[in-house]
Every structure is written in C-alpha cells, then in structure tokens.
C-alpha cells in the first residue's frame, strides 16, 4: 500500500480564493529550515528563527543568516508572541484550507453546470408569483389558527426540585444545627455545649481529603517546576583530549572518535540542549539523545576531514597574528628549503646547457665547459628577477650565463691555433 505524504506549504493557498494567506504563512516559517517556527527566538538584529536553526548558524559562522551581521547566542531572546501565533495558525490551517478548496471547486462547478437551471428557476418563480400571492390571500380561520399555533414556540417550565440542591453525599457525618459544621454523630452533643454559632469554613478538610503524594509524583512536579540549565560555550583549544572526553562522558553522550568529531558532537549537543530550554514543553533527555544519534548517523561521523580544517581557518574567532607567530619558524624553514632546491637546480642544469660551437673550442677549453658554475652575479640577478609564467629557472640561468661568458668564448674561438 502506497503512502502519500502531504507536506504543508505556503503555495497551497494560491489556487484557492484565499490566495492572500500565502504570504502570511510564509512569514510564519523559518528562513533556515523553511518550516513553521519551532521555539522561535529573536536576534539582536530583530530577526526571528527557530532556536535550533539560529544556534547552529551562530556556532558555525557567528552571523545572522538574514542580514549577515555578527551576533552571539547570549543575545537570543524567546519570542512568545510568534510562538502563540504559529500554534493558532497551525490549528486553524486544515479547516481554513478545506473551506477554501471547497469554495474553489464549487465556483468551478457553478459556472459550467448549474448556471442554466438557476436562470430557469428564477423565470418560473416570476411567472407563478401572482397565483401564489392570490392563493395565499384566501385562507380559512382554521388554517390561520393552525398557522398561529405552529408559529408560537412551546415553552416548557422547568420544575425545580429543592431536594437536588440540598443533596449531600452520605459520608457518615452530621451537621451541627447551630453553625452547620459537619462531624460524627457521637460528637454533636459535646460540640453543642461549646458551639459559638460561627459559620463553618467554606473548605473543610475531612479525614479522607488529605492524600499523601507519591515520591514519583513529587519528583515529577519538582522536575517540571525547575527549568533546565543552559550549557555554556567552551574553548576547545584550551582542553586536552582526555579532558574533552571526560566532559562528554559527564554529559552522558558518546566520547569515542577523533578530536574533531568530539568537538562537533559537543557543539551539536549544546545546540540541542539550549534550544530545548527555549521550549514551553521541554523534551526529555532520552528524546534529545535520540536526536543526537540521528545527527550522528546522518552528519556527525560522515563529515569530511577537509571541511573541518577549512572551518577552523574560517571560523569567527580565528587569530591570524597568533597563527603566523606560532608557525613562523616553519614558514622560514620552508622558504630556506625552496631556495636550496632552486640553487641546486641551477647548478645541475647550466653545465649541460652550454653547447659547444665547434670541436676546436671544446678541445681547447675542456676544463671551462666541465667545471662551469653559476657566477655570483647571475645568482643575485635570478633571486631579484621575476620568473615569467611558463619559463623554467634553468633557461633564465642559461641565458644570463651565456651573456656573461660570450666574450670569453669569442676570444677562444678567434685565437689562432698553435
């Protein structure tokens, strides 16, 4: 058997005569989850969201999803007026939508089916009007008397019974004839000797009226009266792994997994718990643990590690100056290694790149071609020169060295052989 899911949406009103209700319903929905407000809270920038939705956004970005202004969870306040408005609209929505759809269907049916018969009926009524008025004018006395008797409503007098008012349940007690105080039969005569005639109190505690409260009911009453306390935000960089695991264990949530997963789990539990504190009917801890387990199966354990690393750089409390100071030595080491590799590439590629013009120059200067190295001025020029895109360092070093060594090679070639 197939199941059909009817998801309420603000577009349900567009095909009905009450199409103007659509923007009203849209204003009662959260801009994050697109559902009706659940425990609505208002931000410092006067925007309203679900408590859980805005807490998740602030814990991730620290900005309002509507206007992108900075905000904090401590500034959130509950919006009871919107909560009552949403509840009233949700209760009235099914009947309103049903009436609107019936009106739309009747309008379509009335325009094409019952339009002609209605016009005929009006004509017939107009033709039969005089006859009907004439027949109504001739009436006998019996008909008029019968009509008057039918028109007058029948009034039935209610019989009041004094015994019903004075009925008192039998509890084995007798009332004092002077003050009306109820007591046992054998205590009436002793009471008459000392009775002052004062009326009995309205609410008198009898012997069986005081019922002891069970421990379970007393405990449940204390729980309902005392609101749950909110969880404070913590700085995870100040906590070690074992301390963070102990904190999760004290809260009653799982403490397994790597450190990034522990942080995400604690943040989600903090959002669930604090959002539950904003509700008029808070959920139990078991229900919150079930929601955390659903989040664990869908998002928590399956988040990519790269996303966590990007979030740590993009989070609102990221300190760039402290980051550069902590990793400054590593940056210097990487720069020094890059310069060493650059010099090594220049030394290994330049001797092979110098071509021999002819056999005489190669034979006359063997040591000059095999032991050639980068001159100091070439190295300095390479360090200050900007390398164009697509050009290797070896090519630039070859060109610079060829320019400097060209006069020496020309002298060797032009010198006469011995």
Curated annotation (Swiss-Prot):
Which parts of this chain are annotated as the region Disordered?
Answer: 110-153, 206-231, 350-389, 399-418
For bias type Polar residues, the affected ranges are: 359-373
Q: Does the keyword DNA repair apply?
A: yes
GO MF terms listed in the record are: single-stranded DNA binding; ubiquitin protein ligase activity; zinc ion binding
Q: What is its main location?
A: nucleus
Instruction: List GO terms (cellular component aspect).
Output: nucleus; Rad6-Rad18 complex
Arranged from A to Z, the UniProt key words for this protein are:
DNA damage, DNA repair, DNA-binding, Metal-binding, Nucleus, Transferase, Ubl conjugation pathway, Zinc, Zinc-finger
Q: Which locations, inside or outside the cell, does it occupy?
A: Nucleus
- All copies of domain SAP, residue ranges: 236-270
- Pfam families attached here? SAP, zf-C3HC4_2
> Where, in this chain's numbering, is Zn(2+) bound?
176, 179, 191, 195
What PROSITE patterns does its record include?
SAP, ZF_RING_1, ZF_RING_2, ZF_UBZ4
Q: Which Gene3D superfamilies match?
A: Zinc/RING finger domain, C3HC4 (zinc finger)
Q: Where are the zinc fingers (RING-type)?
A: 30-68
Example of a GO biological process term = postreplication repair
Quote the catalytic activity from the record: S-ubiquitinyl-[E2 ubiquitin-conjugating enzyme]-L-cysteine + [acceptor protein]-L-lysine = [E2 ubiquitin-conjugating enzyme]-L-cysteine + N(6)-ubiquitinyl-[acceptor protein]-L-lysine
SMART domains in alphabetical order: RING, SAP, ZnF_Rad18
Superkingdom of source: Eukaryota
Zn finger intervals (UBZ4-type): 173-200
> What is the documented function of this protein?
E3 RING-finger protein, member of the UBC2/RAD6 epistasis group. Associates to the E2 ubiquitin conjugating enzyme UBC2/RAD6 to form the UBC2-RAD18 ubiquitin ligase complex involved in postreplicative repair (PRR) of damaged DNA.
Give the family this protein belongs to, as stated in its UniProt record. Belongs to the RAD18 family.
Q: Which NCBIfam families match?
A: rad18
Give the quaternary structure. Interacts with E2 UBC2, forming a complex with ubiquitin ligase activity.
- Write down what this protein is called: Postreplication repair E3 ubiquitin-protein ligase rad18
